[in-house]
Amino acid sequence: LADGKFTEPARTAHARIPQPIHLEDNETVAYFSPEFGVSEMLPQYSGGLGVLAGDHLKAASDMRMPLIGVGLFYRDGFFRQALEQGRQRERYVTNNPRFLALTATPARVELTLADKVVTARVWQANVGRTRLFLLDTDLEINDEWGRRVSDRLYSGDREHRMRQELLMGVGGIRAIRQLGYEPAKFHLNEGHAGFLALELLAEEVGKGLTLSQAVEEIRKRIVFTTHTPVPAGIDRFAPDLMHKYLGVWAERFGVNMNELLELGILPGSDDHFNMAAFCIRV
């Protein structure tokens, strides 16, 4: 170390490294995404959206930003492709979280989905300095229906997708709060976790605000990015599903269901609830 020829290049290289961003503890950012492409050793991603999310976590670690990731643990992950007689086939490989780079946390989250209560445990992955929390409903306390909520990434019908998105959004907030986090900002990587706004709205309405006032209040804390602004890349839910799963939320807000649905319906379109529109408005 006394040899300047050795230490000077190291000092020069270190000086070129950007200084870490120092934020206060109360400025934690919670980054919600349906997939995280951190490593092939943690197969919880499909493609570009997940790779982007994984890179965000790694960059946050490098810059020492107080960011945490929140998503779902998919026991069967995303399908793998195989060819049989020239035709594509899909197959799934079951992932045992205890054999992955995951640690069980003490958090347990309960969420009512329509008329059923589902419980989720929370796994933690360390991405450098950044923490990633993944909710998993494959618990014996749940019935078979409940255990399948977090089974696969981007599979199932629209109702299955709605259950997953309610779990990720509403359940995700409850999970990280149990673990001691109170984020200043919530970053939505696409609209899949947009239902987290329901939990935030309920808290503000509980303080005496109207729904419209609550929307203005939570808007200060939500950041939304969309990467595929085309119909095929945006989740849309039919009115019957919205009434089935969000009717209880309208009651909590003290409004009729139509007033809640207006937050996600585009003018001149059909009556389906558009998650991108909802996330932009809140």
Regions found by a protein language model. Name each.
Residues 1-282:
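Catalytic cores of carbohydrate-active enzymes across secretory and cytosolic contexts
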